[in-house]
Amino acid sequence: MGSACASSFFQFLSITLLLVTLLSMLSTTLASGFSIKEATVQDLQLAFQRKQLTSRKLVEFYLNQIKIQNPVLKGVLEVNPDALAQADRADQERRTKAAGSLSRLHGIPILVKDNIATKDKLNTTAGSFALLGSVVPRDAGVVIKLRKAGAIILGKATLSEWSHYRSIGAPSGWSARGGQGKVCNLLLLLT
């Protein structure tokens, strides 16, 4: 496997793990008995098909959870101001396209680490103020694939500043932009 392929694979894997972690933090069950907390991507797609859920409602739910939990967890560095518009577009496509013609990630909100380039209104800073406001020339390869699959880029997840490419004595999970993040698994066990 080439280093570019390996890098893209590991970026995609970390994005998937972020989605799973975010889903595991949620504890809301919709009136129909559908639990977002325990939902897989397949469950979410089934809820979309059964009209139990829309991408807009899912994005609104995640944005609310980020608003509630992020001041403590500090896991999300920035949310995409266009996420709701992307969700509306996904809902419209779901209404007009043939069932089964959309990808499994269509309409699913996903966070990407802040060192993965997105050519949109989000910053790509690797957690550093030094890159705040810089403009990337294009989406990273993994983001191109996610967008093509219909995923909604919900925002940027924090990471150790410069993706931990600095002093080995620096604490993990710290960045100038994001502050010190918390270990989510431990917090979940304590709640």
Where on the chain are the PLM-derived regions?
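Alpha-helix boundary/capping detector
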Residues: 74, 88-92, 172-173, 179
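Secondary-structure junction/capping motif
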Residues: 54-55, 101-103, 140
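Short glycine-/small-residue-rich flexible loop motifs, especially phosphate/cofactor-binding loops
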Residues: 45, 100, 143-144
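Acidic-residue sensor for enzyme active/binding pockets
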Residues: 86, 93, 161
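An N-terminal boundary/leader segment
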Residues: 2-89
